From Swiss-Prot:
Gene3D superfamilies: D-tyrosyl-tRNA(Tyr) deacylase
GO terms of molecular function: D-tyrosyl-tRNA(Tyr) deacylase activity; Gly-tRNA(Ala) deacylase activity; Ser(Gly)-tRNA(Ala) hydrolase activity; tRNA binding
Subcellular location: Cytoplasm
Keywords linked to the UniProt accession: Cytoplasm, Hydrolase, RNA-binding, tRNA-binding
Signal sequence range: none
GO cellular component: cytoplasm
Record text on subunit structure and interactions: Homodimer.
Classification lineage: Bacteria, Pseudomonadati, Chlorobiota, Chlorobiia, Chlorobiales
Native source species: Prosthecochloris aestuarii (strain DSM 271 / SK 413)
Family that this chain belongs to: Belongs to the DTD family.
PANTHER family assigned to the protein according to its UniProt record, in alphabetical order: D-AMINOACYL-TRNA DEACYLASE 1, D-TYROSYL-TRNA TYR DEACYLASE
Name the UniProt record assigns to this protein: D-aminoacyl-tRNA deacylase
Length: 147
C-alpha cells in the first residue's frame, strides 16, 4: 500500500463533472493498493495517518497530528502511484492490485479509518475520473509505503 499524504488547508474533488467531497484543514491522501495488501497493511496505514505529526503545535514545531488539530481526511484512490516507467515512456501498472481486489481493500481501509477516529473522512469514488483541487499547506507532502 502506498500513500501520498499532503497537509492541506482545504481540498475538494469533482467526480465526472459533479461536485464531490470537500474538507477544510487536514490531510489529502492519494492511496494505491498493491497485490497482497491486506488487513495488516490497512492497520499500519491507518495508525500512521492518524499519528503522523506534520501539523504545527502551539510552539510552531511540526509536532501535532491530524487528530490533535481535529482536522479532516480526503481519501482518493490512485492506482497510478505504482506506475513503472523503467521500460520506456508509457507507464505499466502491474504493481497495482487488480481492480476488484483494490476496490475491496480500499473500502476496508476507509471503513477502518472511519471506525478508528471521530474525524471527518471524505472520499472520492473508486475507479472514477476525478479532479482534485487542494491548497497544500507548507507545502508538506509525505510518501508512505507499508512495510
Amino acid at each position: 500500500m502506498r500513500a501520498v499524504v499532503q497537509r492541506v488547508s482545504c481540498a475538494s474533488l469533482t467526480v465526472e463533472g459533479h461536485s464531490g467531497a470537500q474538507i477544510g484543514p487536514g490531510l489529502t491522501v492519494l492511496l494505491a493498493i498493491a497485490p497482497g495488501d491486506g488487513s495488516r497493511d490497512i492497520d499500519w496505514m491507518v495508525r500512521k495517518l492518524l499519528g503522523l505529526r506534520i501539523f504545527e503545535d502551539d510552539s510552531g514545531k511540526m509536532n501535532a497530528s491530524v487528530v490533535d488539530i481535529r482536522g479532516a481526511l480526503l481519501i482518493v484512490s490512485q492506482f497510478t502511484l505504482y506506475g513503472d516507467t523503467s521500460r520506456g515512456n508509457r507507464p505499466g501498472f502491474s504493481a497495482s492490485a487488480p481492480y476488484e481486489t483494490a476496490h475491496e481493500i480500499y473500502n476496508q481501509f476507509v471503513d477502518r479509518l472511519r471506525s478508528s477516529s471521530p474525524l471527518v473522512v471524505q472520499t472520492g469514488v473508486f475507479g472514477r475520473d476525478m479532479q482534485v483541487s487542494l491548497t497544500n499547506d507548507g507545502p508538506v507532502t509525505m510518501i508512505l509505503d507499508t512495510p
